[in-house]
Amino acid sequence: MAEYWDIYDENRNKTGALHRRGDPFGPGERHLGVEIWTLDEQGRVLLTRRDLRKRFGGLWECPGGSALVGEDSRTAVRRELREETGLDLGDAEPELLGTTVYEEEFVDTYAVRLPFALADVRLQEGETTDARLATFDEVERAVLEGAPWLAGPIRERTLPLLPKLRTFRAQAKK
């Protein structure tokens, strides 16, 4: 079944047009994407490995994806985390760290602290092949140094938001 997204203009206004995944974008067209940095109760970060058949296959990232037609980013980030990992945010409210633009995508990056164990993670076939918990310091170094195991877009999108992610982590420890 085809996946459809709302089309936005360069100022993040919905145009009323729809985009089918895999089709080329027109000039100035964008869609909405989300990602979520999920910290467990010890402050470790959930990373998932991309399916080998996907772009950046075999590399690690935080869960995320594209908002479907009619979804806002908060709805999309909840759905993406649940689909890719089986984790449900329940009453937890993810904090929006900021928005970056990557290729034809506005990406809203969120962070959340969630009580879960790695054994709770259920991978989504065709999307994720593995999951692990990394220390915050390990993830921060990977972003700063451009570690070869980290999916490139994650580095590009996280680098400008790293100060906000650090602040979130510090506040979440309290």
Residue ranges and their predicted role:
Residues 1-35, 39-41:
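Acidic, metal-coordinating catalytic segment for phosphate/diphosphate chemistry
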Residues 5, 29, 44-45, 59, ...:
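A residue-level structural signature of the nucleotidyltransferase/glycosyltransferase Rossmann-like core
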Residues 7, 38, 47, 111-112, ...:
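Conserved hydrophobic "DFG−1" position in protein kinase catalytic cores
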Residues 11, 40-43, 51, 113-118, ...:
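Short loop segments at secondary-structure junctions
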Residues 19-22, 57, 69, 98-174:
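Nudix hydrolase/Nudix homology domain
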Residues 28, 32, 52, 78, ...:
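Active-site segment of metal-dependent pyrophosphate-handling enzymes
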Residues 33-64:
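A glycine-rich, hydrophobic loop/mini-helix early in the fold
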Residues 56-88:
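Helix-adjacent hinge/juxtasegments
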